[in-house]
């Protein structure tokens, strides 16, 4: 099913996603989308308040909640999956954001946030994306030493690739970094780990939605 605004609206109503329904559903969807596309919470609030009064806190809530009605990746046979990770700053500390992209469809199959970057993180992340694969796909990775043992442990074929087919996962991180640049590539000091996970999961879901429309 093509994920249109009408389908999203129907899902929001059916699942009673928002406790209060004083604002139109269309404005809530638009708020989440504009924030994903790069506007700050306050700028989204200022713009949409020309139609309905919306606080920047409401925009934040819409962005985090709407992912619940966007499409999860479909479970199907997949040939090549590119995996990578990048650093993001939360307060004065760094975390790792992992991503897996289907090389053929360019769909993001999953994101994973960790405070470390090791074999266990690799296994946990790869296991989480295999639920969207009906087969054992080939994994494309860079030179990270945390990949080989973990992927062999999972019985997966893999190949080290620096460029070419792995460009799709680099492109995902490029879009992510462009988005986090709005707050200087740094989540606020008071950001909880769960909040950061939810933010990046929302980003992934909006990313896939936009990809599906092109």
UniProtKB/Swiss-Prot annotation:
Taxonomy, superkingdom: Archaea
Signal peptide, first to last residue: none
Disulfide bonds listed in the record: none
Transmembrane portions of the chain: none
Similarity remark: To M.jannaschii MJ0017 and MJ0139.1.
Name by which UniProt lists this protein: Uncharacterized protein MJ1466
Source organism of the structure: Methanocaldococcus jannaschii (strain ATCC 43067 / DSM 2661 / JAL-1 / JCM 10045 / NBRC 100440) (Methanococcus jannaschii)
């Amino acid at each position: 099913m093509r994920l249109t605004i009408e389908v999203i609206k129907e899902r929001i109503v059916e699942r009673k996603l928002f406790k209060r329904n004083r604002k139109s559903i269309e404005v809530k969807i638009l708020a989440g989308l504009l924030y994903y596309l790069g506007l700050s919470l306050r700028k989204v609030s200022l713009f949409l308040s020309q139609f309905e009064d919306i606080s920047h806190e409401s925009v934040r809530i819409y962005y985090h909640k709407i992912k619940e009605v966007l499409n999860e990746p479909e479970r199907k046979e997949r040939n090549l999956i590119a995996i990578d990770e990048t650093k993001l700053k939360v307060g004065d500390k760094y975390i790792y954001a992992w991503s897996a992209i289907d090389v053929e469809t360019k769909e993001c199959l999953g994101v994973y946030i960790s405070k470390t970057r090791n074999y266990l993180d690799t296994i946990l992340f790869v296991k989480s994306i295999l639920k969207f694969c009906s087969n054992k796909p080939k994994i494309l990775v860079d030179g990270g030493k945390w990949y080989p043992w973990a992927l062999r442990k999972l019985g997966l074929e893999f190949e080290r690739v620096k460029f070419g087919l792995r460009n799709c996962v680099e492109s995902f991180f490029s879009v992510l970094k462009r988005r986090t640049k709005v707050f200087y590539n740094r989540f606020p000091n008071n950001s909880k780990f769960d909040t950061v996970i939810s933010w990046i999961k929302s980003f992934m879901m909006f990313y896939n939605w936009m990809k599906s429309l092109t």
